[in-house]
Amino acid sequence: MSDLLGILKQQGQSEEFDAIKIALASPELIRSWSYGEVKKPETINYRTFKPERDGLFCAKTFGPVKDYECLCGKYKRLKHRGVICEKCGVELALAKVRRERMGHIELASPVAHIWFLKSLPSRIGLLLDMTLRDIERVLYFEAFVVVDPGMTELERGQLLNDEAYLDAMEQYGDEFDARMGAEAIRDLLRQIDLEDEIRNLREELPTTNSETKIKKITKRLKLLEAFYESGNKPEWMIMDVLPVLPPDLRPLVPLDGGRFATSDLNDLYRRVINRNNRLKRLLDLNAPDIIVRNEKRMLQESVDALLDNGRRGRAITGTNKRPLKSLADMIKGKQGRFRQNLLGKRVDYSGRSVIVVGPTLKLHQCGLPKKMALELFKPFIFSKLEFRGLATTIKAAKKMVEREESVVWDILDDVIREHPILLNRAPTLHRLGIQAFEPVLIEGKAIQLHPLVCTAYNADFDGDQMAVHVPLTLEAQLEARSLMMSTNNILSPASGEPIIVPSQDVVLGLYYLTREKVNALGEGKIYSSAQEAQNFYEAGHLDIHAKIKIRMPKEDGETGYHLVETTVGRAILAEILPKGMPFDYINRTMTKKVISKVIDSCYRKFGLKETVIFADQLMYTGFKYATRSGASIGIEDMEIPDDKASIIEHADNEVREIESQFRSGLVTNGERYNKVIDIWSRTNELVAKSMMSKIATEEVTDAKGNKVRQESFNPIFMMADSGARGSAAQIRQLAGMRGLMAAPDGSIIETPITANFREGLNVFQYFISTHGARKGLADTALKTANSGYLTRRLVDVAQDVVITEDDCGTDTGILMQPLIEGGDIVEPLHERVLGRVVASDVYIPTQTEPVVKAGTLLDEEWVEKLEKHGVDQVMVRSPITCQTRFGLCAKCYGRDLARGHLVNTGEAVGIIAAQSIGEPGTQLTMRTFHIGGAASRATAANNIQIKTKGVIRLHNIKTVTHENKNLVAVSRSGEVTIVDEFGRERERYKVPYGAVISAQDNSPVEAGQVIATWDPHTHPVISEVSGRLKFVDLIDGITMNRQTDELTGLSNIVIIDAKQRSAAGRDLRPMVKLVTDEGDDIYLAGTNVPAQYYLPVDAIVNFEDGSLVGIGDVIARIPQERSKTRDITGGLPRVADLFEARKPKDSAVMAEVSGLVNFGKETKGKRRLIINVSEDQCHEELIPKWRHISVFEGEHVERGEIIAEGALNPHDILRLLGVGALANYIVNEVQDVYRLQGVKINDKHIEVIVRQMLRKRVITFAGDSKFLVGEQVEESAMLQENDKLLAEGKQIARGTPILLGITKASLATESFISAASFQETTRVLTEAAVSGKVDELRGLKENVMVGRLIPAGTGYTYHQSRKAKRARVAAGGDSSATHTVTASDVEHALSEALNADNHEH
């Protein structure tokens, strides 16, 4: 018998599952869940507080109210378990069954489920091919629908109003069947033959031509196939039976004073039951049709309200005019089931308290108040007390702890030793917001935090609070120690740079310690060791800043000693350097940047342990000497420059001068405003400069008595210079002038604040300042919410990106080049490729062997090698081109930035990427910059002046040579680069059309040389051949006017706008041609395109008809409208726009194909641009007239070249230039925003997000697959289907990548659980239920929600081994694994056991 019990025990083990399916519930299924019908609307008896029988809380249906106790009290006790009381019908069980037992309501008339009716697109409507409006008229009893036309002329699904129905009855009698209400709809749904419909639609699809029809058919087809494949029946969308939620999930609690607090669901259920019972009664009484109809309609409405209140009509409200919370509201939104209870739960063994600074702690420690520790570790203390025999029972132990006996504290010390705890500070924006520490017991009530981890937590000690959590299991402690310990998180996962960097006081102390002072006590002395110098300093014979010489051991492995010039402070600092670290790293003034570099190189050279010790030592030293320095801010330290008054007076005079010019009409108001703003910005700079030079240096006497200048020891200057706190801009406001302020609309007020804070502001100045200050606060509040929402969307889209294999074997990648803007290298190549894997061998011209082989992970050494050889582009593997089906491969991702080695399998790189991009979001600005105002007014560039010596190279520039030997550019996308002697690119500039280039290709240039010039305010039309000018359609007074310039007296020919021309000139297209003296066409070199140039509106022609024109002459010029400047969106909104893949307003028009351009006939307000690919193939594009088109007739364009200027549209880039170009565009644009704020983020994080935006394919060719043309499918799904088709030798489907914004991509994910918990819960669940979706639980969110370990990190291996074990069981290899027991197994075991018993007898 024992083995039978063994089998049954195994049966009770936790169930293991790999997927969750959602489907429609059939009426039979609902009845099978139920433990009884709810017949009455009563809840509980208000006198006895006992549930009413057959009511909403009935104990007979839902189970007993108290454990193992029936309602009437006849049976109590465990021994009656399972007995059903004869008197009250209650089964004796645990009271918690009231949380899981459901009931049901038998509806007297069928009711439509509102989700499938009203959630767009209406599923019922799609199936029946009726409009939602019509279906609603039937359901809410306003019209009849023909269910069965019989032999009549009526159509199935046709609507009849009352008159039409009566007429039809008169005409046909009983030959047809027309009804109203949900029954009619249910019968229509029943009549649908899914297979038949699918076949018909599949046949109809290829024959239709209309776009809308194809769309409609595809939608219906997909829905019908979903129903057919999932086994859902359409009529189940109409309900005969309504399930009732278990009573403990909709509680009714008596409050004191005889009132009750109840869940809204009870009200909604009561309303349904009341109406249902009334309807039953009316049907029994054979009431008049109109009354029954009304009751049925009311029943439908009350069920609607129960399922989703407010989706149709007005929401039903409770007593306090507040809409009742329906079942749908329970699960959606931030307070819904998904986000409140499944994704975020409260945890026990936790506490929170205020944090204070713990400057004496080691990096891996935190101070934990004894009171908190006692409470948090209680169970551990109890067990220890019992184990040591100090307490006999847990109760006794509890008493001991409550009395706080002295032995308890000893045991607490014991329990806490080596038991890490987690500290978390909200908001947790990235993974460094939770770290593990070893607790040190302290008196007091505040948690002590190590100062160096403040940066990671973004914590300060102005009243911040932190939460403590205790990892209980051994595994949890192990993970906390090895992965989350603060000492293991020295590098930031966002950029791979150290995040444990001293700041504020520590920086100030180290800076003060390492400064030099002229003529300090003991200058010029020589000491035998750093220790000796320190002793002399401690004894008071040396100043800490004195310049001295010290005998130091040589570096680079050389033996012997040498003298080093240094200061006493630096010698003191040398004592804490790790062994083997060169002294010259710190033999300089230590600012924050220098310290960060030192820590970084320490980590790379000596590893983790040394770095942690070094960082701690730096902190202790910094604090010590910051205290010794006595640096403090006094009002005298804000030194106002002497020449401030004269500078301001000068500016005032300039402004007066401009005002008088404006009054005499020489300048416009706009010009006057701009000039005034410019003057004041310049003045502000001058005052700031003068002030900084005064504060930054001081005059002292050196040892020889000469006057010399040295860096000042002014505390304000020291704080700013060291990077401890404050900036030049802030000092400027304290001691210079405050400068220009912005008005509420973002424009700049032209009266500046000339005072500074030391002098004080007058009322007017104060008033101007208030606006900016307030806007700052409002901005900050908005920014936090927006940034949080962006992070949430990013996490959602990338949550299932995990490293799942080592190498996907692809040889593609993206090309990395240094980022060069204008003459500056913004990001050198070695920074961009560090930590990436090379995709294809890197060669240099002088060698045949590759410098770096494909598959190499580029670390610091390799990168230096690339730099040395002058490599300027490398093809690296990227997440975007990774071929792994689910997740990513380690090679495509490269280095784990926070650890410094190749990423491990199972690393959740998607979440890390999302956090890295989202966390700095709060530092980004919120505003859109308006052009105008000193902040963003860049003068229009009109030349290229180079910064470095090198050789000039021209890239895809078409030029013609002017007679004065200069080159003139006649191409648009041309660029010029300057390369150094190794052939490395140093500078890159765009060369506009019409620029005059004064240097030849491949000619050497010097720094400072101007190599190209152009007029920034006009677009020229350049002649590419020489000849005589011939006017075509240029008729004076009709298509052109002559305007005389007042100043010069010259007359110009100007083209008139077509709208303003007379009827005769409307269709004329003015152009100029170049012809020979005989009047024959001249063709462009090497083509059969005549040299002719169409002239747009407002073009100014420089030559008269018939005049001679040379090569490179400017025939006409088109003034550039500076008025139509677009607002530049910056900061957070820009990042959001990029990731949401939003189409910009007035986006650039790009050439769809490569070919020759010509202009067709103009249509209303638009120009027709035709690109001829070949004789018989061309592409047309309509472009609004006001857009500036940057190509000319007869010009050759490449696919993807910009035809009309504007912001680029990412969808166009993907379509025309491919995935690589798109990736580059998004990465660079996002990086531009972050770089402006000085935030470093590694490119690969953005690439991971872009990969997720490119998950879908649009099917272009269906082949033999189940997909339809134009359908959007997950790439992995398409590949899987193709694998299947290939195996069967059928035609595979093909698709093109499509870009989705992050919100859309999250909602379009395969996992319905993840999508439903993100946004639009109702829509996602409706769609999933109808198609019977199966969630494979691949992502992180889904697994958190079903309560399993996430398939990432340590959980990744757990899931792998679990699946492997299951596979072994399936193969029959491992018998020790869990059996699945069938009923026959149990029968067999039982009979064997009984037989054995018989034999014994």
Curated annotation (Swiss-Prot):
Residues spanning the membrane: none
CDD domains on file: RNAP_beta'_C, RNAP_beta'_N
Origin: domain of life: Bacteria
Gene Ontology process terms (BP): DNA-templated transcription
Amino acids binding Zn(2+) 2: C808, C882, C889, C892
CC terms in the record's Gene Ontology section: DNA-directed RNA polymerase complex
GO function term, MF aspect, one: DNA binding
Catalytic reactions on record: RNA(n) + a ribonucleoside 5'-triphosphate = RNA(n+1) + diphosphate
UniProt keyword list: DNA-directed RNA polymerase, Magnesium, Metal-binding, Nucleotidyltransferase, Transcription, Transferase, Zinc
Keyword Transmembrane helix: no
Listed NCBIfam families: rpoC_TIGR
Protein role: DNA-dependent RNA polymerase catalyzes the transcription of DNA into RNA using the four ribonucleoside triphosphates as substrates.
The protein's name in its UniProt record: DNA-directed RNA polymerase subunit beta'
Organism per entry: Legionella pneumophila subsp. pneumophila (strain Philadelphia 1 / ATCC 33152 / DSM 7513)
